[in-house]
A protein has these predicted regions:
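His/Asp/Glu-rich mid-to-C-terminal helical/loop segments that flank catalytic regions of hydrolases
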Residues: 414-450
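Alpha-helical metal-binding/catalytic segments enriched in His/Glu/Asp
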Residues: 103, 202, 262, 274, ...
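Metal-dependent peptidase/peptidase-like ectodomains
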Residues: 134-136, 286, 312-313, 322-413
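Bacterial N-terminal signal peptides
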Residues: 41-51
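Soluble metallo-hydrolase cores and metallopeptidase-like ectodomains found primarily
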Residues: 138-169, 217-291, 306, 314-316
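Noncatalytic luminal/extracellular "stalk/propeptide" segments of secretory-pathway proteins
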Residues: 61-68, 73-177, 252
């Protein structure tokens, strides 16, 4: 799952698509309208393919081959042996090579699809109050924040309200650091409004207790850090008590880097021009081993790929392991933009499969024909699921161009994107359930070949 621009103000259950991508939500809906023909064709194809009962019982010999313990070995390799693998790093390439080797070993035609993306990393963040040196501040640089000058900067702090243009007309902001509340606007808009008013940096604090993190989506003109609700209130109190200056030192890397989508293709014997995509993102956030987010999804996809290696399928099945999902769904955006002729009939997205009791079959705003088929198949297999609306993962880019999707997702993991996302928390039994359902969906949608 991606980092939110502002989780508090998301209008859907998880991270808002317009908050983690470069396109606003209205552009997404416009794209969906533009691609209506693509959607209708894909839905009609799926309707024909899925009209008959799946006959899950007839697939039981294949489903019985699924092994959660075997899938768990991939989690160990990716999250424990390799560890955190942020897009654009050497560990990222190591994880890509591991996945490519697994696919090649099982007979898939493997492609490395390279693309560039805006890489961001934090080297150092320090916030101090020279007049109160004993206070400890846990500031976090927001994604795509630029650096301060070497050695940092010291300036007075002024309140900037919610960061709206009118909030900066009530006090002298030029040359100061703006203290801004979370809410109402996207973080990037708050930062740009502060910069336009003359602020040299911005501090955005949570309006609820606890820390927060977020993304500016793209670089802005001034350094931006976040504070917890408690620390934000403390700093605001110092400002109101007579004014305060702070020293802020932010050192980040903002540059274009290269990563890859790893693609494994198994051609269909009856209708090879129709393609079912099975996707899972393979990158992590910094400092997170990524056992559940998303080594678990990669492991489930690799397990399904291994089972299918000797099976003749009617349509082509393509396993795509996306890069730079955590940076803003860049890998799936690139893949969809270069997919070409509209041959994709559906997409199964696997993200966070190893922790939590609830399993969702989800879409975002597009057709739910594949999600409903997945729910039917799950019922035949005796797997409890709920149909939901979820965004914040790679299926959204497929829905953007009208491809029916189903997102298999376990939402109840409070430790994802943290250093505590470790292999001991991933349950092999849950991997087996997700892999069995994903395999049944693939077999039901692609059909058996000659």
């Amino acid at each position: 799952m991606t980092v939110a621009e502002d989780r508090q103000n998301a209008t859907v259950h998880r991270v808002g698509f317009d908050r983690v991508r470069r396109r606003p939500l209205n552009a997404l809906m416009q794209a969906l309208r533009v691609k209506t023909l693509y959607r209708l064709v894909a839905v009609l194809v799926l309707a024909v393919l899925l009209a008959a009962p799946s006959g899950a019982a007839a697939l039981s010999p294949l489903l019985a081959q699924v092994s959660g313990q075997r899938a768990y070995q991939h989690v160990l390799a990716l999250a424990q042996t390799i560890g955190p693998h942020v897009a654009g790093t050497s560990e990222d390439r190591t994880s890509a090579a591991y996945i490519a080797d697994q696919l090649a070993h099982h007979g898939y035609a493997v492609d490395w699809q390279a693309f560039s993306f805006p890489f961001f990393a934090v080297r150092a963040v320090h916030l101090t109050v020279p007049s109160a040196p004993t206070l400890d501040w846990q500031a976090r640089a927001m994604y795509y924040s630029p650096s301060t000058p070497a050695g940092g900067l010291t300036a007075g702090v002024v309140e900037g309200g919610l960061g709206r243009p009118e909030d900066f007309t009530r006090t002298a902001v030029s040359g100061k650091i703006a203290l801004i509340e979370r809410g109402s606007l996207r973080f990037r808009e708050k930062a740009e409004n502060a910069a336009a008013a003359g602020a040299i940096a911005a501090i955005i604090y949570n309006t609820q207790p606890g820390e927060m993190s977020g993304t500016l989506v793209q670089p802005v003109r001034i350094p931006v850090v976040s504070l917890s609700g408690e620390e934000g209130q403390k700093l605001r109190g110092l400002v109101r008590a007579g004014g305060v200056a702070v020293h802020l030192d932010v050192q980040t890397d903002n540059e274009q880097r290269t990563t890859w989508n790893i693609i494994g293709t198994k051609s269909g014997s009856r209708d090879p021009h129709r393609v079912l995509v099975v996707g899972a993102h393979r990158d992590t956030v910094a400092a997170a081993p990524g056992a559940n987010d998303n080594s678990s999804g990669v492991a489930v996809a690799l397990e399904v790929a291994e089972i299918l290696q000797g099976v003749s399928l009617g349509t082509t099945v393509r396993f795509v392991f996306f890069g730079a999902e955590e940076e803003g769904l860049f890998g799936s955006d690139y893949y969809v933009s270069h997919a070409g002729d509209g041959s994709i009939i559906g997409m199964v997205n696997l993200d966070m499969e190893g922790v939590g009791t609830r399993l969702e079959v989800a879409t975002f705003h597009g057709s739910d024909v594949l999600a409903r088929a997945a729910a039917r198949i799950a019922a035949e297999l005796g797997i409890p699921v709920s149909i939901a609306r979820e965004d914040g993962s790679d299926h959204v880019n497929f829905e953007r161009v009208g491809v029916p999707v189903v997102f298999l997702f376990r939402p109840d993991d409070p430790e994802y994107d943290t250093p505590r996302d470790t292999v001991d928390r991933v349950n092999p039994a849950l991997l087996e359930i997700s892999a069995r359902l994903a395999l049944a969906i693939v077999l039901d949608t692609a059909g058996l070949g000659h």
